[in-house]
UniProtKB/Swiss-Prot annotation:
UniProt keyword list: ATP synthesis, ATP-binding, Cell inner membrane, Cell membrane, CF(1), Hydrogen ion transport, Ion transport, Membrane, Nucleotide-binding, Translocase, Transport
An example Gene Ontology CC term for this record: plasma membrane
Example of a GO MF term: ADP binding
InterPro entries attached to this UniProt entry: Alt_ATP_synth_F1_asu (IPR017710), ATP_synth_asu-like_sf (IPR023366), ATP_synth_asu_C (IPR000793), ATP_synth_asu_C_sf (IPR038376), ATP_synth_F1_a_nt-bd_dom (IPR033732), ATP_synth_F1_asu (IPR005294), ATPase_a/bsu_AS (IPR020003), ATPase_F1/V1/A1_a/bsu_N (IPR004100)
Gene: atpA1
Protein name: ATP synthase subunit alpha 1
Membrane topology of this protein: Peripheral membrane protein
Catalyzed reactions per annotation: ATP + H2O + 4 H(+)(in) = ADP + phosphate + 5 H(+)(out)
Length: 510
């Protein structure tokens, strides 16, 4: 009997000596107050700036204001059930987001929660949403074009891979349509896309997603969504989370396109949070660091050097202007940060000129270096002719008597504008664009009635299907458009236009 107890005590002693309690320290604070999208927390003296906190109901928050006795927290979820006295736990790390190939084709929110009902994302790899932008010596120049499939942009305002090109204009002028056309045109071009909807209406986001699915673009696209009825904290972190997802692919040597739709809502969300947290307001009530939140975001878009894989991240931020005022605070900030802008004019939109790109107010500062040589050979004269037309058209509206040369310039310009029109979700291939541009610069459309221009332009595009593969390869290379290739394209265009009316009334306003 004693030997049995001795054995039992020996086992207990051995277990006691080998036992190592799995203690995990936790820092717990308490909510002192809750407001719209924010909370004040006390009792966490060691918390760091931007650190992630856990609230009851698995709601996350970011330590935004770190004061001596209290923390201002931006909430990243529904906060209606939170109240003063609830416990808050430090998590010891910053906000991160899941990344990886398994995200392609998925719809998520900025903290990685799937919204498409397809289950878990199937990835364990995560990246912080805030990451430093690449160093200067880690970057390469913008040298490869990003074809948008939109004639007026690819010809006159070209975009390169690794560029930041701002899209701005009043509401309902086609800004999202420009971005969507660009995404649709990346099909088969080895470019991954990330579409970030920031504070958008649910119906608008649903329409975008439906279009991506119908056109087969979800096969190479990740969608990050925050809706307008969600807390402003989610809208604030959304573009940073989307950029980290895109950077993962860029750092693998891949080309990525990211669309921020739109940064006006992002700026307003940040203004709302800053005012609620009692940060000092500045111009238009925006906080003093409003420029910095966008510059540190857009500086992450770049073309990496060959040593780092040569990947690229092209950014198309969208901004909404009010009453065509591009000199307002947020638009001028973004214009100064980006490498150019595409301005959409309400006046052109109302006239049915779509896309409503105002070429005179649009510019691409670095994209011209990346534009294919075949474009450069035909667009130099086109830009000059279109600029002259826009200037002279103003005088023609006042009924001024114009000489024959001026009337010819105006009629030619009207045909340029007619050829640059394009319906949405109908990207045009490079060969078709070159064929139309070559025909324009050779004045082949000048004898065609304006009413017949859409059909004539389509006929030239259809004729471009007969361009031989070797010519198409040269067009898509860095070679200039040779005289022989140009002659072949011109002959195809002439044959396509033979059946159209040559009835024109020079000088008659249309």
């Amino acid at each position: 009997m004693m030997s049995m107890f001795d054995g039992l005590f020996a086992d207990l002693k051995q277990a006691r000596e080998s036992f190592e309690p799995a203690l995990s320290p936790r820092e717990i604070g308490k909510i002192t107050s809750v407001a719209t999208g924010i909370a004040k927390v006390s009792g966490l003296p060691n918390v760091g700036y931007d650190e992630l906190l856990l609230f009851p109901g698995d709601i996350y928050g970011i330590a935004f204001n770190v004061d001596e006795d209290e923390i201002g927290v931006v909430l990243l979820g529904e906060y209606w059930h939170l109240q003063a006295g609830d416990e808050v736990e430090r998590l010891g790390h910053v906000v991160d987001v899941p990344v990886g190939d398994s995200l392609i084709g998925r719809i998520i929110n900025p903290i990685g929660k799937p919204l498409d009902g397809k289950g878990n994302l199937g990835t364990t790899e995560r990246l912080p949403i805030e990451r430093p932008s690449p160093a200067i010596m880690d970057r390469a120049g913008v040298s490869v074009p990003l074809q948008t499939g939109i004639k007026v942009i690819d010809a006159l305002i070209p975009v390169g891979r690794g560029q930041r090109e701002l899209i701005l204009g009043d509401r309902q002028t086609g800004k999202t349509a420009i971005a969507m056309d660009t995404i649709l045109n990346q099909r088969g071009k080895n470019v991954l896309c990330v579409y970030c909807a920031i504070g958008q209406r649910a119906s608008g986001v649903a329409k975008v997603i439906a279009t991506l699915r119908e056109q087969g673009a979800m096969e190479y696209t990740v969608v990050v969504v925050t809706e307008g009825n969600e807390p402003p904290g989610l809208a604030y972190v959304a573009p940073y989370a989307a950029t980290s997802i895109a950077e993962y692919f860029m750092e693998q040597g891949r080309d990525v396109l990211i669309v921020y739709d739109d940064l006006t809502h992002h700026a307003r969300a940040y203004r709302e949070l800053s005012l609620l947290l009692r940060r000092p307001p500045g111009r238009e009530a925006f906080p003093g660091d409003i420029f910095y939140i966008h510059s540190r975001l857009l500086e992450r878009a770049t073309h990496l050097s060959k040593e780092l894989g040569g990947g690229s991240l092209t950014a198309l931020p969208i901004i909404e202007t009010e009453a065509q005022d591009i000199s307002a605070y947020i638009p001028t900030n973004l214009i100064s940060i980006t490498d150019g802008q595409i301005y959409l004019s309400p006046a052109l939109f109302e006239l049915g000129i779509l896309p409503a790109v105002d070429v005179g107010k649009s510019v691409s500062r670095v994209g011209g270096k990346a534009q294919r040589a075949a474009y450069r050979g035909v667009t130099v004269d086109l830009k000059l002719a279109y600029a002259q037309f826009e200037e002279l058209e103003t005088f023609a509206r006042f009924g001024a008597r114009l000489d024959d040369d001026t009337l010819k310039i105006i009629e030619h310009g009207r045909r340029i504008r007619a050829c640059l029109k394009q319906p949405e979700f109908a990207p045009v291939s490079m060969a078709e664009q070159i064929a139309v541009l070559v025909a324009l610069t050779a004045d082949l459309f000048d004898d065609i009635n304006l009413d017949n221009m859409p059909a004539a332009e389509q006929a030239v595009r259809d004729a471009a299907a007969n361009i031989t593969d070797d010519i198409v390869e040269r067009l898509e290379s860095t070679d200039k458009l040779s005289k022989d290739d140009k002659a072949v394209i011109l002959e195809l265009a002439r044959q396509a236009l033979e059946t159209f009316s040559t009835d024109t009334d020079l000088g008659e306003p249309r």
